[in-house]
């Protein structure tokens, strides 16, 4: 079905837990503006976050699908989830803050620290329960990134006319969680985890300065019981997942699907923790891929798909989701084809070595995305009339 394959080597900066953590009792103040200030000291570092509401990454009609036959889970309180999401874009924090009872904070503090409630501590201090602040380090590892060029793709590199001021760009996601990923959330909430992850993706997209909004409209939770029925494109006989073959089968399956959730999504992404890579001619598997996506096809129904691997946690997952989404929006790797003017050594998200500026997109990627969103024949799924809160500058 798909004939062109680009495999490019890049050094992914991953967040690896160091084993260091400290128990803290964070203080929080909420101002009239809705901004929350959180302070604590951990691992010899004074932390102060100024957090703004960030519930827009969850759609008002957010839908969770699970169960043997893919039923809608009506137990999810959408407005409660949205109300508890906050971010500090300046430092790269994305948190779920639960004040229904004792204060519970969960999520990303910055690129080096995570916070979660400490369930081993029963006592509280001045009504504040204990939290663990966990240190992670950035570890450079080599992985391959895969881009598939659908047959008949004709790429242009010219601007069209700018978007009218009353038009905004919003990318709506559906995440399909492969059973190994779903299983890891027997205790903690997947919805909270993916919402915090999506806020990190939003912070990364903000570096494009194009006013792009992102939102999760649905999660399809796969389990061992429903995976074969709801996602027959996922291999059953082998734990290893051939990235190209799986994406090919995934696209073909959903291309013929009448599922309204899939139809309404701008990007459909499979999340897995299984080994993702390729087999050689002797059947040896190389576990070397973090992601795979179609290039320049966000609004093409049969090609709006990607696969990402969660390898070392939420920050790496956010980076990979942003990276593969940018491919669908038309971005090449820095230093390649449409991004020749940006060196891969600069270290942006789309470079082979993103340890320097790994939270931002390069000027070349911005140019390609800007070209896509101004091409009326291509941008129809992500450009919409702005609401009162989202007027473009």
Swiss-Prot record:
Contains several disulfide bonds. Its cofactor is Zn(2+). GO terms for molecular function: metal ion binding; metalloendopeptidase activity; toxin activity. Gene3D superfamilies: Collagenase (Catalytic Domain). InterPro entries: MetalloPept_cat_dom_sf, Peptidase_M12B. Keywords: Disulfide bond, Glycoprotein, Hydrolase, Metal-binding, Metalloprotease, Protease, Secreted, Signal, Toxin, Zinc. Residues 378-393 are annotated as: Disintegrin-like domain. Residues 167-377 form the Peptidase M12B domain. Metalloprotease. This is Venom metalloproteinase BumaMPs1.
């Amino acid at each position: 079905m798909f004939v062109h394959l680009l495999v490019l080597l890049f050094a992914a900066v991953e967040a690896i837990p160091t084993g260091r953590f400290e128990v803290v009792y964070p203080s929080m103040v909420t101002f009239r503006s809705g901004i929350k200030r959180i302070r604590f000291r951990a691992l010899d570092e004074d932390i102060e976050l100024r957090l703004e509401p960030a519930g827009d990454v969850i759609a008002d009609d957010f839908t969770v699908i699970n169960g043997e036959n893919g039923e809608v889970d009506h137990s999810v309180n959408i407005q409660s989830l949205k109300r508890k999401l906050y971010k500090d874009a300046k430092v790269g924090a994305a948190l779920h803050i639960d004040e229904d009872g004792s204060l519970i904070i969960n999520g990303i503090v910055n690129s080096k620290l995570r916070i979660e409630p400490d369930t081993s501590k029963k006592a509280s201090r001045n009504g504040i329960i204990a939290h663990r602040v966990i240190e992670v380090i950035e570890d450079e590892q080599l992985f391959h990134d895969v881009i598939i060029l659908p047959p008949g793709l004709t790429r242009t590199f010219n601007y069209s006319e700018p978007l009218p001021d009353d038009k905004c760009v919003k990318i709506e996601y559906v995440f399909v969680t492969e059973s190994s990923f779903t299983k890891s959330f027997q205790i903690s909430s997947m919805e909270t985890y993916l919402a915090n992850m999506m806020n990190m993706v939003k912070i990364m997209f903000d570096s494009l300065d194009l006013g792009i909004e992102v939102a999760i409209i649905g999660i399809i939770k796969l389990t061992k019981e429903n995976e074969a029925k709801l996602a027959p494109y996922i291999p059953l006989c082998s734990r290893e997942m051939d990235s190209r073959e799986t994406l090919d089968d995934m696209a073909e399956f959903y291309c013929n699907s009448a599922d309204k959730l899939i139809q309404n999504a701008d990007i459909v992404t499979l999340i897995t923790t299984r080994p993702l890579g390729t087999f050689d001619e002797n059947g040896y598997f190389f576990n070397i891929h973090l992601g795979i996506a179609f290039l320049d096809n966000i609004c093409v129904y049969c090609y709006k798909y990607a696969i990402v691997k969660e390898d070392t946690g939420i920050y790496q997952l956010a980076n990979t989701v942003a990276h593969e989404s940018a491919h669908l929006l038309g971005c090449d790797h820095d230093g390649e084809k449409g991004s020749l003017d940006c060196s891969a050594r600069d270290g942006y998200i789309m470079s082979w070595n993103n340890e320097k500026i790994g939270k931002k997109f390069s000027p070349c990627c911005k140019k390609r995305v800007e070209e896509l969103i101004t091409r009326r024949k291509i941008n129809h799924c992500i450009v919409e009339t702005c609401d009162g809160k989202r007027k473009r500058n």
